[in-house]
């Protein structure tokens, strides 16, 4: 049995290319075994509140010192952490928005990157606790950011690899769907390449 966590984040909904291919990959992975499970969080349709003073205080306090409001905030964050830790495979879909990830995805990260739960500090440095997971990132972009002159503007993939690695998730595969603003032929080529890559990865899993 494999537990799959699908995180989609594009505010474009059904028109989103990253949502489409992340969903397709997660679906193909789930279909490999009847015992596989799939949990889907759509961060645009059901946004996770950004960190505020209540939530920040809640995750820093022992449970018996929290106010009622802080307990609710901590329980919500704990649920997200539990979903992540239970997953064997994580599929993340995001568009490249102003050279980085969607803010809703950042909010999810801020809730699951928790000291003592998904990482810990030691005398020799931080240690990730969310280990043993395969992560797939589907990144959609209007331009081309996987290579060429604009690669340095792609802050999304380096950031995601850094923060995921910090939590112990180092086996990361990136699927680019890019050049989507370069006309119909470019879109057709990008979509075909993404479809082939999704099929390849699903078969290899």
Swiss-Prot record:
Pfam families assigned: Flavodoxin_2
Keywords recorded for this protein, A-Z: Flavoprotein, FMN, NAD, Oxidoreductase
Cofactor binding comment, as recorded: Binds 1 FMN per subunit.
Gene: azoR
Protein's UniProt name: FMN-dependent NADH:quinone oxidoreductase
Oxidoreductase in keyword set: yes
Subunit structure: Homodimer.
EC assignment: 1.6.5.-, 1.7.1.17
Domain of life the protein comes from: Bacteria
The protein's required cofactors: FMN
């Amino acid at each position: 049995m494999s537990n799959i966590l699908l995180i989609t984040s594009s505010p474009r909904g059904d028109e989103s290319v990253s949502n489409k291919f992340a969903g397709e990959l997660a679906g193909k992975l789930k279909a490999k075994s009847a015992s596989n499970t799939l949990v889907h969080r759509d961060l645009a349709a059901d946004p996770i509140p950004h960190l505020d003073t209540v939530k920040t205080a809640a995750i820093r306090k022992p449970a018996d010192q929290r106010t009622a409001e802080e307990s609710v905030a901590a329980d919500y964050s704990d649920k997200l952490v539990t979903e992540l830790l239970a997953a064997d495979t994580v599929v993340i879909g995001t568009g490249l928005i102003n050279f980085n990830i969607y803010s809703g995805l950042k909010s999810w990260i801020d809730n699951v990157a928790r000291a003592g739960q998904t990482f810990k500090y030691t005398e020799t440095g931080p240690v990730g606790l969310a280990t043993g997971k395969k992560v797939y990132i589907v990144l959609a972009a209007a331009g081309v950011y996987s290579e060429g002159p604009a690669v340095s503007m792609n802050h999304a993939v380096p950031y995601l690899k850094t923060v995921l690695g910090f939590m112990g998730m180092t086996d990361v595969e990136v699927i680019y769907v890019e050049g989507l603003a370069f006309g119909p032929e470019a879109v057709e080529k990008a979509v075909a390449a993404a479809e082939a890559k999704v099929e390849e990865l699903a078969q290899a899993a």
